[in-house]
């Protein structure tokens, strides 16, 4: 039931206090009708007795308390969903912004989603190919997983996000795959880059885009990832598709949370972020997964920039607790011209062993992954030793490992943002690099596998 009030008591920043309300619900959608006919939308943030605190999406500037009316609409923020969403571009509140025809929704869904019973969850165990060797082979992405990318200011996470959105796929061609892309608090130039890339490569045909710009209100940034995840859940659980949700930049989302928390005069937690930051992030990340009896799945790649490149900052720290690993971008590799600059040693996919092996990727996947990790770590150590003591101090085997590490970065990790490698190409490249090492050094691979795959004469 719609209720209308003229009892606005106070306006503070983006917040408004409405008095003498009854039957109002948390997160209920509201409309503010101004004297000049303008209508602004908002959402109930807090209820205390007969007072409601609401946040206005478009801001509170020029709102006259005496002449404005507030309507409580009786339902939370919703997204109209339909199979026709594919190929369309929405703003952060789910309104079309691509100048295309209006969308006729099949239904409207609450953007906060429904709680998934843990018992109903199915274990993630199917491979998703991104076409990026450092991810597919060494930090494998599995359907239903949440695998964040930890970047820093100035690093090419924008290009990496576009590459994953463009190239990601499932190996079974009979299964439908879709990408839901949520851009949170990005600049106009970044939005243009993503739109242009999606359109030029044709990736937009299998994608749903939500674009929230830096000059949009903070409350819209809070809604954007929820809009994207609602669209993803609809496509996955009602249309049977495997959906990859890419959200960039989650740091902007957390900054918006901090801004709203400060406006509400809440007691701040670590570095000024609200004490419920962990819980709030969990309401997003835990919407990834698979459900028993459902054909589809929701996989997440949240991308965030670490403030001051600090892994202990609350945003990457709490994200790491909730998610199943992390892909870390390295400034050192970026300066060396390695693209994408994925630092494979501190990166981790906790579910990688569940999505690899015969019938999923290839039988030699796990063994070559372990051997490459080991050899690269030894090669890095040898290179560091050479810097301190000089190359002459290295043994012959150490020199081979140092050369291996160099080639590994330049040929394996460095593939550019336009190269789409199949998992077979990646595994074959891994064997080519391992053939540099003496056979006696390949201790993590079984003899029969060495006989089958190792290049002759090496």
From Swiss-Prot:
CDD domains associated with the record: ATP-synt_V_A-type_beta_C, ATP-synt_V_A-type_beta_N, V_A-ATPase_B
GO biological-process terms attached to the record: proton motive force-driven plasma membrane ATP synthesis
Pfam families the record matches: ATP-synt_ab (PF00006), ATP-synt_ab_N (PF02874), ATP-synt_VA_C (PF22919)
Keywords of this entry: ATP synthesis, Hydrogen ion transport, Ion transport, Transport
Coiled coil: none
Single annotated GO MF: ATP binding
InterPro entries: ATP-synt_VA_C, ATPase_a/bsu_AS, ATPase_F1/V1/A1_a/bsu_N, ATPase_F1/V1/A1_a/bsu_nucl-bd, P-loop_NTPase, V-ATPase_su_B/beta
Family, similarity comment: Belongs to the ATPase alpha/beta chains family.
The protein's role, per its UniProt record: Produces ATP from ADP in the presence of a proton gradient across the membrane. The V-type beta chain is a regulatory subunit.
Protein name per its UniProtKB record: V-type ATP synthase beta chain
Organism: Enterococcus faecalis (strain ATCC 700802 / V583)
Gene transcribed to yield this protein: atpB
């Amino acid at each position: 039931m719609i209720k209308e009030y003229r009892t606005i008591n106070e306006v503070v920043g983006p917040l408004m206090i409405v008095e003498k309300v009854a039957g109002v619900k948390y997160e209920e959608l509201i409309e503010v009708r101004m004297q000049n006919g303008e209508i602004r939308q908002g959402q109930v943030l807090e209820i205390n007795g007969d007072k409601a605190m609401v946040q206005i999406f478009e801001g509170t500037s020029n709102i006259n308390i005496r002449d404005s009316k507030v309507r409580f609409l009786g339902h939370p923020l919703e997204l109209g969903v339909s199979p026709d969403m594919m190929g369309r571009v929405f703003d952060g509140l789910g309104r079309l912004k691509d100048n295309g025809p209006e969308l006729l929704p099949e239904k409207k869904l609450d953007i906060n989603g429904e709680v998934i019973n843990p018992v109903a969850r199915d274990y993630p165990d199917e491979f998703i190919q991104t076409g990026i060797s450092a991810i597919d082979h060494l930090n494998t992405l599995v359907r239903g997983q949440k695998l964040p990318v930890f970047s820093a200011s100035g690093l090419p996470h924008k290009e990496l996000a576009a590459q994953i959105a463009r190239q990601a796929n499932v190996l079974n061609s009979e299964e439908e795959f879709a990408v839901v892309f949520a851009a949170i608090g990005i600049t106009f130039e970044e939005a243009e880059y993503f739109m242009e890339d999606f359109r030029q490569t044709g990736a937009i045909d299998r994608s749903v885009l939500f674009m929230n710009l830096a000059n949009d209100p903070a409350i819209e940034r809070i809604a954007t990832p929820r809009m994207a995840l609602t669209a993803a859940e609809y496509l996955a659980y009602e249309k049977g598709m495997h959906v990859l949700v890419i959200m960039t930049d989650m740091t902007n989302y957390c900054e918006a949370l901090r801004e709203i928390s400060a406006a509400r005069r809440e007691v701040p937690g670590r570095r000024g972020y609200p004490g419920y930051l962990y819980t709030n992030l969990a309401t997003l990340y835990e919407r990834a997964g698979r459900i028993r009896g459902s054909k589809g799945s929701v996989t997440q790649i949240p991308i965030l920039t670490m403030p001051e490149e600090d892994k202990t900052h609350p945003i990457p720290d709490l994200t790491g607790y909730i998610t199943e690993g992390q892909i870390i971008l390295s400034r050192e590799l970026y300066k060396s011209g390695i693209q994408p600059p994925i630092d494979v040693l501190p990166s981790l996919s906790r579910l990688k062993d569940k999505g690899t092996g015969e019938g999923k990727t290839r039988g030699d996947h796990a063994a070559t992954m372990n051997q490459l990790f080991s050899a690269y770590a030894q090669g890095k150590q040898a290179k560091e030793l050479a810097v301190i003591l000089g190359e002459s101090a290295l043994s012959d085997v150490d020199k081979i490992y140092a050369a291996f590490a160099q080639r590994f970065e330049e040929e394996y990790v460095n593939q550019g943002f336009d190269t789409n490698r199949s998992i077979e190409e990646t595994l074959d490249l891994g064997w080519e690099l391992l053939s540099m090492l003496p056979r006696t050094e390949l201790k993590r691979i079984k003899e029969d596998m060495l006989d089958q795959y190792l290049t002759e004469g090496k």
